[in-house]
Amino acid sequence: MAWWKAWIEQEGVTVKSSSHFNPDPDAETLYKAMKGIGTNEQAIIDVLTKRSNTQRQQIAKSFKAQFGKDLTETLKSELSGKFERLIVALMYPPYRYEAKELHDAMKSLGTKEGVIIEILASRTKNQLREIMKAYEEDYGSSLEEDIQADTSGYLERILVCLLQGSRDDVSSFVDPGLALQDAHDLYAAGEKIRGTDEMKFITILCTRSATHLLRVFEEYEKIANKSIEDSIKSETHGSLEEAMLTVVKCTQNLHSYFAERLYYAMKGAGTRDGTLIRNIVSRSEIDLNLIKCHFKKMYGKTLSSMIMEDTSGDYKNALLSLVGSDP
């Protein structure tokens, strides 16, 4: 499924609002789970992974009102490691969480370009607007200006272009003539010449609607006798290549893109826990069920089975609770 349709697929949700919800007993359960010596991690998992983000915010307010403590700070003091990172991620309102991930990606030692590319290429215009607003409120600076300060060259240009959200056009109308012209322009900017006109690629990939781009990719393959992905791989490299390929993947099928992100977060030695946590948390109330279906189709195993193989303890249990039953 193309990326712009993924946001309206209600059947994709794995974490739903709890029926007959009352934040006061939930807050009390969490308080008792962390009171005194030791912590009842399972009680924390049972409450926070089975409530929607809106409900978690209500629980946090009740916790503060009843016990005079900040719930997130209390969780941080009681938990540790990857489990703490996951549970704290659940407590952020969605746009503030993504703003935090972007801020951390730029302010850590060495910029994590992959995180920035993932978020900017896969969100809609309205979501990007909310993320930018949350970023400025929480960090006192402009997301666009921080990206410009932290990246350079063509990568900076494509990220700033993506931030404008110009691809978020759900119109089904496509001008065949313009699509064909764009395909010819891409061919002329890469395969046809020695060297590459990167700005032509950036302009077309980041300013055309998703429906239009799908037609462009079809026309391009007829002209070049190779896919747009193969041309990007041969014409660019590094983070710019990753950014362009991500735009193409998200345009073609957003669920497959996230399935791939989750798979490679766990494949091979070690686990990219940041990628695993971010994508499970951020997609759990949007389309994680659909991502799970694509994951199984693409890799011949379920997302939950791979989580069981690759993680352990309370961290594993919390992830599995968020992911839900197998497709």
Curated annotation (Swiss-Prot):
Which molecular-function annotations from GO does this UniProt entry contain? calcium ion binding; calcium-dependent phospholipid binding; phosphatidylserine binding
Repeat as a keyword of this entry, yes or no, is: yes
Sites where the protein binds Ca(2+): 266, 268, 270, 310
Task: Tell me the SMART domains matching this sequence.
Answer: ANX
Q: Is Metal-binding included in the keywords of this UniProt record?
A: yes
Parts of the chain that traverse the membrane: none
Concerning Pfam families, the annotation shows: Annexin (PF00191)
Which cellular component terms (GO) are annotated to the entry?
A: cytoplasm; sarcolemma; vesicle membrane
Arranged from A to Z, the UniProt key words for this protein are: Annexin, Blood coagulation, Calcium, Calcium/phospholipid-binding, Hemostasis, Metal-binding, Repeat
Q: Name one GO biological process term.
A: endosome organization
Function, in words: This protein is an anticoagulant protein that acts as an indirect inhibitor of the thromboplastin-specific complex, which is involved in the blood coagulation cascade.
Q: Which family does it belong to?
A: Belongs to the annexin family.
- This protein's domain notes: A pair of annexin repeats may form one binding site for calcium and phospholipid.
Q: What is this protein called?
A: Annexin A8
Gene that produces this protein: ANXA8
